[in-house]
């Protein structure tokens, strides 16, 4: 089977697994084309010797060879599955195996077979779990630990909702340069320090990354009565071939938390995005970031899928 043929089969299966409400946002032909492109590259990577050599050098594990860092296509219950080794935070001691693509439904038989194969094929890494994306939840009979929640909503539907009210009047001021980066970085560090459970899931962008976000034109300082209380920023990012946006940064400083500002701030950003270019506002939020998930739901960005870790060696 050629890479293109396998990628097409994976793409059609992935499209079929999408929830109906998500499919309604999308042009099916465009989505299928985008999935084919991404999956053709993923399928070809399993023969990319240069990539696996770089991967090995970046995450060295005693006793491992370059081939151990290679993705593999396997057959489980008559279905093709593409598995790939990963390391959380590029830490060689935190290995997991990613289900990159598969044919057919996301059912217990497929995941059990993948878990058995992953444990054997990559035993040198001692992987902790198999990771997969499900729409919207894991099949019954499989033990799963939550990771990231996939949240999304269209700007059109969000802007048609009644806007959430803020307890205090807020103003959003467009950012045009990086002069406020240090203030933002300090506030972000205070947030990280105050939420140790999220420490491994949060990354403060450097100034160069911040500058690139600002260039897209939708970065805003948030002020209350002239006092800076936070920042919110979005960048354009297609959603399965549809026009879309990702909220790249969203932060309220300590003094502004608990003041019912988060949802109005996010709604204000989305109204500006909609006026610029209607589309899907999407992204991922860690399941422990309860406040951010609540804000997303208040605005109209619902959980449509989940990244799950399926523990290896469990009774699942």
What are these regions (language model features)?
Residues 137-152, 287-305:
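Conserved active-site alpha-helix within GNAT-family acetyltransferase domains
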Residues 98-108, 248-258:
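A short, internal acetyl-CoA/4′-phosphopantetheine-binding micro-motif in the GNAT/acyltransferase core
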Residues 151-162, 302-316:
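Conserved catalytic-core motifs of GNAT/GCN5-like acyltransferases
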Residues 196-250, 254:
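A conserved beta-strand-loop-helix scaffold within acyl/acetyltransferase catalytic domains
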Residues 109-120, 252, 258-275, 293-298:
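Conserved acetyl-CoA-binding loop-helix of GNAT-fold acetyltransferases
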Residues 45, 53-85, 215-232:
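Conserved beta-hairpin
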Residues 2-55, 163-206:
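Short amphipathic alpha-helix that is part of the acyltransferase structural core
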Residues 3-14, 101-183:
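Acyl-donor-binding surface of acyltransferase catalytic domains
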């Amino acid at each position: 089977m050629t890479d293109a043929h396998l990628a097409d089969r994976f793409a059609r299966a992935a499209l079929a697994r999408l929830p109906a409400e998500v499919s309604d946002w999308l042009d099916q032909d465009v989505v299928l084309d985008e999935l084919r492109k991404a999956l053709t590259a993923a399928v070809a990577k399993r023969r990319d010797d240069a990539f696996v050599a770089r991967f090995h050098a970046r995450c060295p594990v005693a006793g491992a060879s370059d081939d151990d860092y290679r993705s593999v296509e396997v057959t489980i219950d008559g279905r093709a599955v593409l598995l790939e080794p990963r390391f959380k935070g590029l830490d060689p001691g935190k290995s997991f195996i990613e289900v990159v693509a598969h044919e057919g439904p996301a059912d217990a038989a497929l995941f059990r077979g993948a878990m058995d194969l992953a444990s054997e094929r990559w035993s040198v890494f001692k992987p902790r779990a198999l990771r997969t994306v499900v729409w919207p939840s894991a099949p019954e009979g499989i033990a799963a630990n939550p990771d990231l929640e996939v949240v999304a909503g269209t700007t059109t539907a969000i802007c048609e909702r009644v806007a959430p009210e803020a307890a205090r009047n807020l103003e959003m001021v467009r950012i045009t340069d990086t002069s406020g980066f240090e203030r933002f970085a300090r506030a972000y560090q205070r947030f990280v320090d105050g939420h140790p459970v999220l420490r491994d899931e949060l990354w403060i962008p450097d100034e160069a990354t911040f500058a690139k976000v600002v260039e897209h034109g939708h970065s805003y300082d948030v002020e209350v009565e002239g006092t800076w209380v936070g920042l919110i920023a979005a960048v354009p990012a297609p959603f399965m071939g549809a026009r879309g946006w990702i909220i790249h940064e969203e932060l309220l400083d300590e003094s502004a938390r608990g003041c019912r500002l988060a949802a109005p701030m996010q709604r204000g950003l989305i109204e500006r995005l909609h006026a610029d270019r209607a589309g899907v506002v999407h992204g991922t939020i860690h399941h422990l970031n309860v406040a951010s998930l609540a804000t997303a739901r208040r605005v109209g960005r619902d959980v449509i899928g989940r990244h799950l870790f399926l523990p290896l060696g469990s009774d699942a």
